[in-house]
Amino acid sequence: MLLKNILSVLAFALLIDAAPVKRSPGFVTLDFNVKRSLVDPDDPTVESKRSPLFLDLDPTKIPVDDTGRNDGVDKRGPVAVKLDNEIITYSADITVGSNNQKLSVIVDTGSSDLWIPDSKAICIPKWRGDRGDFCKNNGSYSPAASSTSKNLNTRFEIKYADGSYAKGNLYQDTVGIGGASVKNQLFANVWSTSAHKGILGIGFQANEATRTPYDNLPISLKKQGIIAKNAYSLFLNSPEASSGQIIFGGIDKAKYSGSLVELPITSDRTLSVGLRSVNVMGRNVNVNAGVLLDSGTTISYFTPSIARSIIYALGGQVHFDSAGNKAYVADCKTSGTVDFQFDKNLKISVPASEFLYQLYYTNGKPYPKCEIRVRESEDNILGDNFMRSAYIVYDLDDKKISMAQVKYTSESNIVAIN
């Protein structure tokens, strides 16, 4: 998902929604409830599970849519969060304030600020179906109800590339996540937004939307001794699975095959690494550029020439809707793999089916072709349709990202990142 803050910083998002279920000496865990809803798959802020996309079009045309603690001497350890498999977002429950006000927020690896809607926030409709207090349907924050709330009297504003935004003031209060309690955490209490949920940004401090840098939540987790390092690992699980997991300060060694390969982060602001090439069922496409690993983006984006090469290698054909909008479609039964070659001979293989999305007419019948979920952009972005095939460790302290081919399993072997 593409976002921009008011300082024109490019950001991207991963989403998470959860409730703490247990706490042990080794780990803090969050379990998530799967919800189903039907929304526009191009809305990066709406909770959009794996529901079918229904199309209002002429039958002959196609549209364009769119964790815990270690028992050893060091008491710091990983904080594990179980993720819902949603078509757009992964969302998680947090608590805010002395009275533990519960909110569901987007956990965003691309942005770096936590913001939540005020209980009196004005919700500005942007997407079809936005009605009433939609921006507060996933919880809101009442500063007056918390004895530990502090208004810093500093304005906050962030704007996303899709045009949605959030405006408010900076506050400090206690934030709870996965059973861990973070004291005096700085965040924005938003009084006007067109987004459907608050966002918990966990990216680089340099990507914060504030003029003055501050300790965002991952940094606070480390400084307050909850985790040993500002790092987290991500397991989105298979397309059919109902949940995945993010672990703050830890790695689940059962969730990948072979060894993790370390790659340097190539940007001072975004979580990007170098990608050499993409091999589409035997046809090689050179990239040789940085690519953002963005769990908050459902599909993948490349600069135009690279995107078109990948699309055509997948058998893409151009179709137009009645308004003249262009879409690339292909046979839904296309098989094989799309192999991503990174530095250090790291290869991540992705089923071709991950890049094909079934379309439906408004009468519920499937369209005979699938949309290719690769699009043209100014930026190279690998979204969820790539990331489900990789186990990814983001180390913000050492500015590196480690990856391996994912292993879909219910087994677990979580160790702390020290």
UniProtKB/Swiss-Prot annotation:
Control of this protein's activity: Inhibited by pepstatin A analogs.
Subcellular localization, as worded in the UniProt entry: Secreted
Catalytic reaction(s) noted: Preferential cleavage at the carboxyl of hydrophobic amino acids, but fails to cleave 15-Leu-|-Tyr-16, 16-Tyr-|-Leu-17 and 24-Phe-|-Phe-25 of insulin B chain. Activates trypsinogen, and degrades keratin
Disulfide bond positions: 123-135, 332-370
GO biological process: fungal-type cell wall organization; proteolysis; signal peptide processing; single-species biofilm formation; single-species biofilm formation on inanimate substrate; symbiont-mediated perturbation of host immune response
EC class name: hydrolase
Family: Belongs to the peptidase A1 family.
Residue ranges listed under propeptide: 19-76
The UniProt record lists the keyword Iron: no
Induction, as annotated: Expressed during development of germ tubes, pseudohyphae and true hyphae. Expressed in greater amounts in the mature biofilms compared to early biofilms during inflammatory disorder of the palatal mucosa among denture wearers.
Record's function text: Secreted aspartic peptidases (SAPs) are a group of ten acidic hydrolases considered as key virulence factors. These enzymes supply the fungus with nutrient amino acids as well as are able to degrade the selected host's proteins involved in the immune defense. Moreover, acts toward human hemoglobin though limited proteolysis to generate a variety of antimicrobial hemocidins, enabling to compete with the other microorganisms of the same physiological niche using the microbicidal peptides generated from the host protein.
Protein name as catalogued: Secreted aspartic protease 6
pH dependence, record text: Optimum pH is 5.0.
Active-site residues, as the UniProt record annotates them: 108, 294
Gene3D superfamilies: Acid Proteases (2.40.70.10)
Glycosylated position list: 138
Protein's gene: SAP6
Keywords: Aspartyl protease, Cleavage on pair of basic residues, Disulfide bond, Glycoprotein, Hydrolase, Metal-binding, Protease, Secreted, Signal, Virulence, Zinc, Zymogen
Gene Ontology molecular function terms on file: aspartic-type endopeptidase activity; metal ion binding
A Pfam family recorded for this sequence: Asp
GO CC, alphabetical: extracellular region; fungal biofilm matrix; fungal-type cell wall
Extent of the signal sequence: 1-18
UniProt binding sites for Zn(2+): 268
InterPro entries: Aspartic_peptidase_A1 (IPR001461), Aspartic_peptidase_AS (IPR001969), PEPTIDASE_A1 (IPR033121), Peptidase_aspartic_dom_sf (IPR021109), SAP-like (IPR033876)
EC number: 3.4.23.24
Domain Peptidase A1: 90-404
